[in-house]
Amino acid sequence: MLGPTLVTDRLILRPPEAIDFEPWAAFMLDEESAKFVGGLTPAPTTWRGLRSMIGCWAADGFGMFSVIERASGQWVGRLGPWSPFGWPGKEVGWGIARAHLGKGYATEGAAASIDWAIDHLGWTDIIHCIDPANTPSEGVAKRLGSVNRGPGQMPPPFENAPINVWGQSPAEWKARKR
């Protein structure tokens, strides 16, 4: 395995593996799930995307985690730290499969990822790039203690996607947790 495994009350966060392809592809073929994470994506493109995320772990020592529900062992999404070239900052992002929305998994997993990014990667700022129409993700950001910093610009091919940059510093994160 290329990185750590983080365990929360209900989740296991681990670097993605080739065995995650089928649920990851189903996630990216579900219109509701994929709406704010690049849109519907055919399986061959998702295959390359999954391999790219695995490559982030190999090249950078971090990337999105696969999210596994502890009770069932089921893949329920992907989330975590990443910082693609041209991105507005170092992001902890999330995407949870439709069947598992509303369970608090994004907040629980993102909180563990923020802790790890601050403590192990030394990140000095954490952002979340959120489409203004994605009110559920805005709710996650608020629960995490992040604030809306205003509009941001994504790199190609997402340059026309509207986003607001939400974020906080490690000091703000740690103060909120007290």
Tell where the protein language model's regions lie, with residue ranges.
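Acyl-donor (CoA/ACP) binding surface of acyl/acetyltransferases
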Residues: 1-36, 55, 64-178
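Extracellular/periplasmic catalytic domains that process cell-envelope and extracellular macromolecules
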Residues: 58
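Conserved GNAT-fold acetyl-CoA-binding loop/helix
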Residues: 32-52
